[in-house]
Amino acid sequence: MNTEILKVDRDNLGGVSMAHAGEIIRSGGLVAFPTETVYGLGGDALNPKSSKKIYEAKGRPSDNPLIVHIADIDAIRKIAILDESCYEIKDIEGTVNRLAEAFWPGPLTIILKKTDAVPYETTGGLDTVAIRMPSDKIAAVFIRESCGYVAAPSANISGRPSPTKVSHVIEDLSGRVDMIIDGGDVDIGLESTIVDLTEDRPYILRPGAVTEQMLRAVIPDVTVDKGLKKDSDAAPKAPGMKYRHYAPKGELTIVTGDIDRVIDYINDRAQVCKADLIKCGVICPDEHILRYKAPVVKCTGRLGDEEAVAKRLYSVLREFDAEGVEVIYSESFDSDGIGSAVMNRLIKAAGHKIVQV
């Protein structure tokens, strides 16, 4: 397949190029496009054949649900049931409206019960649908030029770090999709927060830039789902819950504890790697770069700046891949605010390999 790369001007999105991208979606093709979180791999959410193509292009398990992206709040009614009798949560429509008013367009995905308009191929066989309205201007125009309902997981090979730059998308999906829209680097760098409204209370299934504290200000009874814990047997209802995600090619380990002991431990391991002719890398904040003796040290931003870490994390993991790093050690990061999402992704990327020193 010949993949077209479309470079767009954010200040002039009304031309024929975006209309062409939309036509690809309407005709059953696939287009990778930027959002404020990560790049997405888009197809017609209401066309089961398009959803199957997404799974095939990514090498993604077909029971891993896709998020349906919309550009207008009224679009929910076609794809989600809002009848209060179908939910345990009281005033479901009011809850959705409060969340939408507070966080849409933006990095929040809401799970509701699906209508028959949404094929099971899009929902991973579930009776629920995950819905998001992205804030990125290119994404909004693209969705409107398409069918209005764009199913899109991250635009990468399944299991790899999510793409935050168009070069990441080209590396993974060139030759696998019809078009890649080049919108530059993304703003946030981590996938959206996911909130499930189909149970007895709102549950956070995936942390993101919309934090637990921010959600509590709007829906006070929200809580974190037990499926976020490593040993949970809960069935996955959202992307990122079941399979290994975000992983570099090298073996990643997180090291926690007193920072001096952490640095000493990692430096000791780096020496072992050197003796064994294994290329070793380290992830750390800017302030610690000179304290490490590994051949490759990547910084994610200043101490306490978890937003910078979020924006850099996936790029750093891909840089290690490009440099052939075989073993990676990472410091842990503050879990407050978006730091919770950073640690969620880092732990998954490490396959839950954590060393306490």
Where do the protein language model's features map onto the residues?
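Active-site-adjacent structural elements in enzyme catalytic cores
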Residues: 1-357
